[in-house]
């Protein structure tokens, strides 16, 4: 859930409108070779947003149980961001240690790729509204962009995950790939 969803008591309109798995605030689903994990990054989340919260314990266990080729965690508030809203440091959980391959967020109306703690974080809030300015780059910031709206495209196979951010004019601004680690022989 995002900050605007929580502006109504208990995020009720959002939760009434959408039918989502689990408790509907944080949940997971599998699509092809990717296991997606949604977490509620808002400070009003009843189960907490710190690395020791009930929600984090759920994520840690769910990631460790996943058998998909790729595990992607997504949320609204970014753990790392160089833009005007800045980083939500309480969301700097040990995602890589728990088994995540990629962390996606929004909130700041920018595109930024950050590499921290053995994992890639992407902030992509350029789907609409006006872009935000950048401030001081956070450690590990690889690329920052906020000139044109755009979208992120992710393609995954069992061995490779490719992410590409393109503007509405179809100009590719950033692209990166992740290779799945070799599985040990039985």
Where are these regions (language model features)?
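Extended active-site neighborhood of metal-dependent phosphoesterases/phosphodiesterases
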Residues: 1-70, 90-102, 110-157
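Short, well-ordered beta-to-alpha junction loops that form the rim of enzyme active sites
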Residues: 41, 75-78, 107, 166
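N-terminal active-site segment of His-dependent metallophosphoesterases
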Residues: 54, 61, 81-82, 185
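Short acidic, glycine-rich surface-loop motifs adjacent to enzyme active sites
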Residues: 66-82
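Active-site His/acidic residue clusters
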Residues: 82-88
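A short C-terminal boundary segment appended to hydrolase-like catalytic domains
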Residues: 143-186
């Amino acid at each position: 859930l995002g900050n605007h969803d929580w502006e109504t008591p208990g995020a009720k309109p959002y939760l009434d409108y959408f039918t989502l798995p689990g408790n509907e605030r944080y949940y997971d689903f599998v699509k092809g070779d990717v296991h997606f994990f949604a977490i509620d990054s808002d400070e009003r989340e009843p189960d907490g947003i710190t690395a020791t919260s009930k929600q984090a314990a759920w994520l840690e266990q769910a990631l460790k149980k996943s058998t998909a080729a790729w595990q992607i965690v997504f949320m609204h508030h970014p753990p790392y961001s160089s833009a005007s809203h800045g980083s939500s440091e309480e969301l700097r959980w040990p995602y890589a240690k728990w088994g995540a391959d990629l962390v996606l967020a929004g909130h700041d109306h920018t595109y930024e790729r950050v590499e921290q703690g053995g994992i890639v974080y992407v902030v992509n809030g350029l789907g609409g509204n006006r872009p935000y300015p950048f401030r001081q780059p956070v450690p590990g910031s690889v690329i920052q962009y906020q000139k044109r709206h755009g979208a992120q495209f992710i393609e995954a196979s069992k061995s490779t995950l490719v992410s590409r951010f393109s503007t509405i004019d179809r100009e590719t601004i950033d692209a990166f790939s992740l290779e799945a680690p070799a599985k040990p022989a039985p």
